[in-house]
């Protein structure tokens, strides 16, 4: 890779990292589940695009397989499956009123700053693109956790979990130029199995208490005690 190509690769990767992080912010403020799933699919598309660009720039052919797996699983299959459950359980009309939405968004911004603070010690020994990409990847992971904490619907928790995996996967692409293919296939299979199990879990909970609101589950636990 010559210097000009490397500079283009750096700019594109950092731009995609910023957009992936932006999608995590947008997911934080979403009250409608269908919109949340759509934004997650867009984040998956950006991740697949980043993987394909890394494969082309680094001449790493097995990253093309990773890009295809990401496209199939996180842009098509998993969003389709979650959307199907949302429609089947008639949750698409529900609007989740977020408590302290402004505070949640400020907390998300603080997590991005914290991510850069955590990675500050390695700035002297790492490249500009690596530090920024890793910081934004860590921010995506933390924002996914915040999404799970701030939303009440179990489906939003699943989307947050998948978003965390997106952040970890992007960090692996940037820092290691891609994991070994067998590891990537294993991770993709684990994500697929987790998505299917979550779908079964949704149906069982919905049939039991006719809701996927986590607050209702907590109240049931308090009554049992």
What is each PLM-predicted segment?
Residues 1-225:
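Alpha-helical transmembrane segments of multi-pass membrane proteins predominantly involved
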């Amino acid at each position: 890779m010559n210097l000009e190509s490397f500079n283009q690769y750096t700019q594109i990767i950092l731009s995609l990292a910023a957009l992936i992080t932006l999608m995590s912010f947008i997911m934080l403020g979403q009250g409608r589940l269908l919109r949340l799933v759509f934004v997650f699919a867009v984040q998956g598309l950006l991740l697949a695009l980043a993987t394909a660009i890394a494969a082309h720039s680094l001449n790493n052919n097995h990253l093309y397989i990773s890009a295809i797996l990401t496209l199939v699983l996180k842009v098509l299959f998993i969003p389709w499956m979650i959307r199907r459950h949302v429609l089947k359980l008639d949750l698409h009309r529900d609007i989740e009123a977020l408590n302290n939405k402004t505070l949640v968004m400020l907390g998300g911004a603080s997590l991005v700053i914290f991510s850069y603070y955590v990675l500050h010690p390695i700035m002297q020994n790492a490249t500009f693109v690596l530090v920024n990409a890793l910081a934004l990847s860590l921010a995506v992971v933390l924002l996914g956790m915040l999404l799970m904490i701030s939303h009440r619907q179990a489906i939003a928790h699943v989307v947050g979990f998948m978003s965390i995996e997106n952040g970890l996967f992007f960090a692996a692409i940037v820092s290691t130029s891609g994991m070994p293919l067998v590891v990537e296939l294993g991770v993709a299979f684990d994500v697929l199995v987790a998505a299917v199990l979550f779908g079964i879990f949704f149906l069982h909970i919905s049939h039991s208490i006719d809701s996927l609101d986590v607050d209702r589950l907590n109240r049931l636990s308090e009554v049992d005690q």
